[in-house]
Curated annotation (Swiss-Prot):
Job description of the protein: Lignin degradation and detoxification of lignin-derived products.
Catalytic activity: 4 hydroquinone + O2 = 4 benzosemiquinone + 2 H2O
Gene from which the chain derives: LAC22
Boundaries of every Plastocyanin-like domain copy: 36-152, 162-314, 414-548
Annotated Gene3D superfamilies: Cupredoxins - blue copper proteins (2.60.40.420)
Leader sequence segment: 1-25
PANTHER family: LACCASE-4 (PTHR11709:SF370), MULTI-COPPER OXIDASE (PTHR11709)
Protein name: Laccase-22
Length: 564
């Protein structure tokens, strides 16, 4: 066997070290962002108002990273409101201090102050979102998170020609903080929004708009495009369509799916969906539409937000060249069921669906809204949100700090695992089941297998609820209409390739079962992502204990953690 000269061996070692450093740097980049929270005047629907923004943009800037990257975001508060930012769907493994919900994991960033969010993107790739997580500020303080695969790792589907971020939202002519504050004072529901938006604009068919207004997506015939679609609306489940074009779903909530074709998407607040669109139509402009889904007797904004898909070499700019789209009926439950039934995890060798097959902790949580007595309210009652008949009261000290430092009197660990009052949840149950108030949490040991059945209730009216769990992804193993039956319902569960996500819509008058593993120590918020329901108290939190190893332990709090 020939022996390499010393200089040749040193050269090879140096080359190997360089390649190793390149590989490590490719997977361990630190990305720096600065978010300045500032007021800006914005004109929509014939009127102008000041809104909170990040860096003066609405929606805010897109945060780009790759799987494995460390992300540093300095948030500077230049406005008169307290602010926090939540990185919706980012797992925050052991870094719960940076999760963002006010008074759950941190005190707000006060006017004139700043906070450096510091987290790593671990085992995730796809589309998520960031948004303010205090009061109703996320109405305008929100934006996209685009997590690209590691360098050299392809998508598990044909690579698109280009990608585009599509942020769906709502617009109020009034100040949104005034809207919810007045509603809370009176004890009633808030005013609905005045329009739906696509990338911040109601679109070319809205009040005071011209045919050229709104977001425009330019395409070339024969090319395939990936749309990263985010529902950043406060209170509405939304349908999304593109006139004359089929959509191929390839990912939801930053998890790859088995691809399937559809002409209509259903996206609840907080959810994301990536679709491929083939530009296979003739020259012209084609309408994109966003419209509400509500299959309960609840008032929602029925305005359709629009944008245009514009083919290259389209000569005419008049409305005559615009292909319109017909939104689904507002109560199109059959379209929603077909869409959600089509969602399955990819469950490939590279992207397995690690569904817990056994259950250590089983919870049945009823979710809904009810009424409590309120002598000062306009009707003598106050609308409240509940989980297991508990209306959550926000503390003045963050629960994570109280947990970490063993501060007494901030929360109690007696959140009920099953309903305290059992009744026909989706039938003719009690119409005035007074709730209990409390800052109650449910404690979980590290790495337990957890099943949560989310059961809608009809105390006022059955209604869908988009439930978001911080700190974890979960598998949606089952759903059904009516009341969950612990004896028969589990036989319908999908434990092979259920969809994995961080936000799930509990169907109107039905139930959804999710499973996850409590492998992330800290305090993790779970709440309805209809902001009005969260304001009313439809929320709770899990406290997850540390594991035995340092890698299973919550990191210490940062030195610049905001103080209350």
């Amino acid at each position: 066997m020939a022996v390499l000269p010393e200089s040749r061996r040193l050269s090879l070692l140096l080359m190997a070290a360089c390649f190793l450093l390149q590989a490590l740097s490719a997977h361990a980049i630190t990305r720096h962002y600065k978010f300045n929270v500032v007021m800006r005047n914005m004109t929509r629907l014939c009127s102008t108002k000041p809104i909170l923004t990040v860096n003066g943009k609405f929606p805010g800037p897109t945060l780009y990273a790759r799987e494995g990257d460390n992300v540093l975001v300095k948030v500077v508060n230049h406005v008169a409101h307290n602010v926090t930012i939540h990185w919706h769907g980012v797992r925050q493994i052991r870094t719960g201090w940076y999760d963002g919900p006010a008074y759950i994991t941190q005190c707000p960033i006060q006017p004139g102050s700043s906070f450096l969010y510091n987290f790593t993107i671990t085992g995730q790739r796809g589309t998520l979102l960031w948004h303010a997580h205090i009061n109703w500020l996320r109405a305008t303080v929100h934006g996209a998170i685009v997590i690209l695969p590691k360098l050299g790792v392809p998508y598990p589907f044909p690579a698109p020609h280009k990608e585009a971020v599509i942020v769906l939202g709502e617009w109020w002519k009034e100040d949104t903080e005034t809207v919810i504050n007045q509603a809370m004072q009176l004890g009633v529901g808030p005013n609905i929004s005045d329009s739906h938006t696509i990338n911040g604009h109601p679109g070319p068919l809205s009040e005071c708009a011209s045919s050229q207004d709104g977001f425009k997506l330019s395409v070339e015939n024969g090319k395939t495009y990936m749309l990263r679609i985010i529902n950043a609306a406060l209170n509405d489940d939304l349908f999304f369509k593109v006139a004359g074009h089929e959509l191929t779903v390839v990912e939801v909530d930053a998890v790859y799916t088995k691809p399937f074709k559809t002409d209509t998407l259903l996206i609840t607040p907080g959810q994301t969906t990536n679709v491929l669109v083939r530009a296979n139509q003739g020259a012209g402009r084609y309408l994109l539409s966003v419209s509400p889904f509500m299959d309960a007797p609840v008032q929602v904004d029925n305005k359709t937000g629009t944008a245009t898909l514009h083919y290259a070499n389209t000569v005419s700019s008049s409305m005559a060249s615009l292909t319109l789209v017909k939104p689904p009926p507002q109560n199109a439950t059959h379209i929603v069921s077909k869409f959600t039934d089509s969602l399955h995890s990819l469950n490939s060798k590279e992207y397995p669906a690690n569904v817990p097959q056994t259950v250590d902790h089983s919870l049945l949580l009823t979710v809904g809204v009810g009424v409590n007595p309120c002598p000062s309210c306009i009707n003598g009652t106050r609308v409240v949100g509940t989980i297991n008949n508990v209306t959550f009261i926000m503390p003045s000290t963050p629960i994570l700090q109280a947990h970490y430092y063993n501060i007494p009197g901030v929360f109690t660990e007696d959140f009920p695992a099953t309903p305290l009052h059992k009744f026909n949840y989706t039938g003719s149950g009690p119409k005035n089941l007074q709730t209990m108030n409390g800052t109650r949490v449910y404690r979980l040991p590290y790495n337990a297998s957890v099943q949560v059945v989310l059961q809608d209730t009809g105390i006022i009216s059955p209604e869908s609820h988009p439930i978001h769990l911080h700190g974890f992804n979960f598998f949606v193993v089952g759903k059904g209409v009516g009341n969950y039956n612990p004896r028969t319902s589990p036989s319908t569960f999908n434990l092979i390739d259920p969809i994995e996500r961080n936000t799930i819509g509990v169907p109107t008058g039905g139930w959804t079962a999710i499973r996850f593993r409590s492998d992330n120590p800290g305090v993790w918020f779970m709440h309805c992502h209809f902001e009005v329901h969260t304001s009313w108290g439809l929320k709770m939190a899990f406290v997850v204990d540390n594991g035995k190893r340092p890698s299973e332990t919550l990191i210490p709090p940062p030195k610049d953690l905001p103080q209350c």
